[in-house]
Amino acid sequence: AGLFDLIETVAPYVAALKTHVDLVDDWSPEAWGRFCKAANEADLLIFEDRKFADIGKISRAQMSGIYDVRSWSDLVTAHLISGPDVVDGLQAGWKDANREGGVLLLAQMSSRGNLLNPDYTREVVRTGCAHDGVVGFIGNGSRPEEVSALRDAVGEEKMIWTPGVNLAVGDGEMGQRY
């Protein structure tokens, strides 16, 4: 019931729901299908924050898997550490399900000690801006100056999403920064 209450509460104020499907304790295909239907009826995108990072062939297979992410997600996150084929694999996964979706590449992270340095960020932006399957980038919501620099690098053609935003600035649990 909690997820359905969430849809009802936030639908008028947000465009997408960020999920971590593998953290849903009582997950079942039937219940998740009802959740996705309710989100769709509320005109909400479902954004699975899976952070795919493997080669294209494996990423494509992961889009099916036990959770069949390709059948219900509108957006997914991915690291570009394995190269641009990860995006091709994710797009192929959606195509296998006769759907379309978009990839948000992690250009920055708000977690303490992460290894996404400025050189990596530049390469992610360069590669992502050239790929039609990439709809945007994840920026560091805890550092406005970094998000501003990311916007300058990305331009206006792609979105920047900033998880890690919280009304209380500071450190959260296990390295999360707000």
Predicted regions located by residue number:
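Conserved N-terminal beta1-alpha1 strand-loop-helix module at the mouth
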Residues: 1-47, 116-120, 127-134
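Short acidic active-site motifs
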Residues: 2, 6, 58, 62, ...
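Hydrophobic faces of well-ordered beta-strands that scaffold small-molecule active sites
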Residues: 1, 17-19, 46-50, 76-78, ...
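A C-terminal functional module that forms or caps the active site or interfaces directly
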Residues: 135, 139-178
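Short beta->alpha connector loops
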Residues: 23, 29, 81-83, 141-144, ...
